[in-house]
Curated annotation (Swiss-Prot):
PROSITE patterns: PROA. Keywords: Amino-acid biosynthesis, Cytoplasm, NADP, Oxidoreductase, Proline biosynthesis. It holds the Pfam family Aldedh. It is an enzyme of class 1 (oxidoreductase). Belongs to the gamma-glutamyl phosphate reductase family. One of its GO terms (molecular function) is glutamate-5-semialdehyde dehydrogenase activity. The keyword Amino-acid biosynthesis applies. It comes from Leptospira interrogans serogroup Icterohaemorrhagiae serovar Lai (strain 56601). It catalyses: L-glutamate 5-semialdehyde + phosphate + NADP(+) = L-glutamyl 5-phosphate + NADPH + H(+). This is Gamma-glutamyl phosphate reductase. Its EC number is 1.2.1.41. One of its GO terms (cellular component) is cytoplasm. The lineage of its organism: Bacteria, Pseudomonadati, Spirochaetota, Spirochaetia, Leptospirales.
Amino acid sequence: MKEIEYVQDLCSRAKKASKVLKQLSSSKKNKVLLSLADLLEKRKAEILLANELDLKDGKEKKLSSALMDRLLLNEKRIFSMASAVREIAALPDPIGEVTRGITLPNGLELVTRRVPLGVVMVIYESRPNVTIDVGALSFKSGNACILRGGSEAFYSNEILIKLFHEILIKEEIDIGSVVFVDKTDRSFMIPFFQQTSLIDIVVPRGGEGLIRFVSENSKIPVVKHDKGVCNLYIDQDADPEKVIPIVINSKVQRPGVCNSTENLILHNGYPFRKELLEALAKEGVELLLDPSSLALYPNGKPVKEQDYLEEFLDLRLSVKTVSSLEEALAFIEKTSSGHTEAIVTEDLNTARIFTNSLDSAALFINCSTRFHDGGEFGLGAEVGISTGKLHVRGPMGLVHLTTTTTYVTGNGQIRG
């Protein structure tokens, strides 16, 4: 089958399924999701076997430890996937929600309700759990989805889609509701981006190269899950009891994800900078240090200006020393990708200036950047974290997979 025929076949299947999905009852959708959660746990052995194939390929390709961690599925992560699906099932169904109701002076009755977007295409890398998260969110919100995962997670994604399809078949629902792109060659992606009548939105989540590729080639609206160059500023008035736990968690807990801190900004008036750097080194973090920090911790490496713009997704951290809040804010303006910025301070006025001066999807005070996540925000899961400003910003959850239709009821009115 030629590329264009393959693409149009998948897109047409999704479009057809979307017409049925928008009419499914909440109870039917929830039944499917709860059955899927149970099946993920029941068939975990099959999932782990498929994941082992991906991990084996990853080792042969010499993927970094952080990327291997993103790829890894274990029993705990499978149960976590199942739990996320149950959380999505428990969320209120946004479809049909009335966002506005009004009777006009001429007697016309206007009711605006939430409706599905239609067909959502998501392109992602490495993390197999995205397959389930996005599939479940799309299904619950009445959307068909086209999922194109990275080649490094092919076998894991394949088995997860298979299990989803088993449930759909059992419940007599079109498997076009969740479409899997089983071609990993990038040349197969471009024809998808031309299907303006069949796909309603494209969501790329991955590295800078993927985001640029999709943005430059798509004729379909794109919601970008761009790179996470997250900045964490330690103010001179930061509480030392909070600093080390927050910084360690922000960098070390899962370095291979987009809400991990990449730039640590230290006010030179903070008295425990050396202890903080030593604590990070003890956790295995490779420190890229400016001259001031290097003087405190000579075992680090000199930082390059380009490092401050990098999303490492690894146990590497760039450090910048500043002498004022204004200098910290100027640095963040130059380096931020618009994802997450955080401050640790006990000065409420400093915190207020920090948050009022910056323009990112999330701004945190005295807590880890790792909290910028759909699950942590109470959304159940997320399609991605949008760093753009149109359609949605921040975690893209159920409600963000909807648009609105206004229903107007009259009694013979005409416009004068």
